[in-house]
């Protein structure tokens, strides 16, 4: 039996069923819990996609991810416009596809407001954003919240900004521990996509995670951003993997499909697979083909092939 075809048929059925439930006017409590589509057996690495990279309505993006066989989805701040009923609706739809939500973002408008980790005068506003994101994480059963360092403060030394980042992270981690949610800090490039961003080095992000030294503060290692800013992301990957909860994937230059640029994805995936890593690998690229579902299927298939080849037979991805 073709399991990929079977799972796709199942997702098509569940999507239709979810739509009928929601259009019928019945409440979530009146409906039986959906049966999730199971991930690959014995998987220890979970595939995900950052939904902002996909075209369409939010519902269409979810359907695209499900049709591609992706196991989880990442949000920015789409939930900000949701009512309690909307939150329940989307939890139901996502579960009906056999997926879950793995991350949301705190301080989505960090470029526009003084909410950075690197300036002590921004700290209370930053912590207020963390509290707000934690409340939504609990509502949506999201285990992780992405933190952005914020931009360089021109009137502060690099050392002072780094010290502030560590202190802000420690304060936020206390809040996250109480909520049983994990904070993950992301490296970004300032050369192309995010001019002025402070935490542009995976090595420095790793240093901060080690210094905070708490299981609720981890690293979101964006391989694309590291390549654009500093070159080959592989050396830091080999050191960082015990501290990473999420890897982000896009090729450079262009931030498009893996395999369309210069990055050596087979080597990167092999290193992740051999490392014993047991977290998320999330696609955060802008699909080149018109058919974004086919693009995601190709990317996920290549990723799983390399990961599985690198892992022991008992622990496939």
Feature locations, PLM:
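Histidine-acidic metal/acid-base catalytic patches
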Residues: 2-46, 50, 55-66, 199-221, ...
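Active-site acidic/histidine proton-transfer and metal-coordination neighborhood
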Residues: 12-25, 34-41, 96, 113-218, ...
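Active-site-proximal loop/turn and secondary-structure-junction residues that shape catalytic pockets
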Residues: 53-55, 79, 107-110, 151-153, ...
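Catalytic domains of carbohydrate-active enzymes, especially glycoside hydrolases
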Residues: 61-78, 141
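Short glycine/serine/threonine/alanine-rich loop segments
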Residues: 70, 99, 142, 181, ...
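Glycine-rich, proline-tolerant flexible connector loops at the mouths of alpha/beta enzymes
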Residues: 75-95, 149-153, 193
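Mid-chain, structured segments of secreted extracytoplasmic proteins
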Residues: 90-120
